[in-house]
Amino acid sequence: MTQTLETLYSQLTGHAPESVEALPGAGSNRSYYRLKGTPTLIGVCGTSREENEAFIYLSRHFQAQHLPVPAVHAVSNDGLCYLQDDLGTDSLFQLIAHGRETGEFGSTEKDLLKKVIRLLPRIQFEGAQGLDFGKCYPAVEFNHRSILWDLNYFKYCFLKATGVEFREDLLEDDFEALCQTLIKSMEPQPVFMYRDFQSRNIMVKDGEPYLIDFQGGRKGPLYYDVASFLWQAKANYPDSLRQELIDEYLEALRPYKQIEKEVFLSRLRHVVLFRTLQVLGAYGFRGYFEKKTHFIESIPFAIENLRQLLQEGFPEYPYLCEVLQRMTELKQFAAARNRRNLTVTVMSFSYRKGIPEDESGNGGGYVFDCRAVHNPGRYEQYKSLTGLDRPVIEFLEKDGEITEFLRHTDALVDAHVQRFLERGFSHLMICFGCTGGQHRSVYSAQHTAMHLHKKFKINVHLIHREQQIDQLLKAK
């Protein structure tokens, strides 16, 4: 693919690029490259010709409407690769990092967010003028069929993966009710629905926002993109800021459409619920099945958004809300309640009963085998005791093997926790196993949990699986 991009670049400029640099991937199967030279361009390679054609058509249409999007300069004969403007390296998501991490957005961050949200009505209405929606991919419009696609995406790729039991017929009834509510929110005049209008898909160059990743856009309700932007899982916007940005949006919307704020909010909440479920479906597929870390890390944030939505209630969808409430209360989503803190799960277990499964989906951490350490369980006086009992503790510490063992595991775990804190990760799992999950593993897990809780400002979820002990040590 890079050879195709280099050929396109040479045909366009008359010379080869100075270098080709692979860029981090996102949620799709497209690959991105920076081709440095005069000029520097972004190369895109996709697996779907139809998806690429949609982006190229929309880019050219939006440019004709004087909307800030990257220009497409060259397309390969097979339609799978193309070159577009390089908008730099600053995404809106990166530029609001301080606010996202602290929950306190400064004036510069707020001004930038307001500039972006005021751009949205232009995209929705001016972008729709003269647009051939038949060229949109994979759907022409937001309709009954596409809504049910997304709801079933959530059901099969996320809800079923959690293990929550539910009645298919009752859930489908509420899906249908939500579908009808959403269809009623459509405007009679054409509105372009960006679909994934969120801070990762906004680049900022010379202080001005530019739009990328709009190839999934279609005709749809104006509420959807507001929901996508303001309820982005990891954006961490406080409700007061959301209200400010809604006011900015409604003010910018006036030249195109007049709508009372109360009416707008009453319709928006249903779209926010739908968008949250759609996002969880994507996180389930991209995270649980494709094992992409960014999506797994975003799940606790989306769960917290859902938890807040359910507090307001949706009497129109009683069974759906009941199922969602049970889902948000699952143990694997406990970290979402303390989403600014890392949660480390420390567990003891018996190898006879299998290695514990990481229910967070993250798959990060260690499984330490304690079976090489001198076993108190071999002696009659300790067989009925556990690694929490004083006689077993004294035996292990006097023997000394476990002290040396834990000196090494502490060093590994401490470095891992420190790095996860620096990178803003939400979950790490540390397991200690022995033959019966009673003596050595219990002592080791207890020691490690207390050590981590004392040393770091983190939540420690301590589980002695075979002893049926489950304890959450909250960050100090």
Q: Which ranges hold each PLM region?
A:
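Juxta-kinase regulatory segment immediately upstream of eukaryotic protein kinase catalytic domains
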Residues: 1-17
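Active-site activation/catalytic loop segments of kinase-like enzymes and analogous catalytic loops
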Residues: 152-161, 222-258, 273-289, 302-309
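C-terminal accessory "lid"/substrate-recognition subdomains
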Residues: 334-428, 468-470
